[in-house]
Amino acid sequence: MTPDRPVPDRPDTIGPAVDHGAVDNYTPDSGARQEIVWQGKFITVHKRGRWEYVGRARNIRAAVIAAIEDGHVLLVEQYRVPLGRNCLELPAGLVGDDDDCQNEDALTAAGRELEEETGYRAAQLTDLGTYYSSPGMVSESFTLVRACGLQKINSGGGTAGENITVHRVSIASLSGFIASKRSDNVAIDVRLLMLMGAKLLEGELA
């Protein structure tokens, strides 16, 4: 006899069933013509029906790096002009933003950005999938990359014109570190939530 195997919990779907092959059923605006309202070097403003949203120009994507090893994670802090203050983030960078590397892949870009921003080189980079951070107003996606086998090769800090501070933070003390930065008026990147996830949902970080 084959032993009984536990049946995984299935999520409950609440609301009408959606035919994922019928895109026009999603919203009255899904079939509207997409217009380019404005385009710069790095971003494009689109309008489709009633919706206005922003996307990356020239098929530029982003790579976000989760560099976690020996119970520590690498974070970066830098001034962000749209926020008008410093922001605490995971290392990240654009993929295919330079004219001579428009066809580069996310793992290549992630390795380069990790070295430039943090000064660490990864022996292994793993693609953890594509994600969308604010799909109601931004069409940009990012590839989450796990970096392992870290070796310090320089001081990091970014390229010319960047002034990046590198933090190597214990996972065990991460919530306290983030709280301290928040009290110093440092903005917190939403992607840090994945490092805090379970504890945050359980109310341990309230």
Language model regions located:
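Active-site-adjacent beta-strand/loop module that shapes the phosphate/pyrophosphate-binding cleft
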Residues: 44-47, 134-153
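Short loop segments at secondary-structure junctions
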Residues: 69-72, 79, 148-152, 171-172
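Conserved hydrophobic/aromatic beta-strand scaffold that supports enzyme active sites
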Residues: 45-47, 66, 75, 144-146, ...
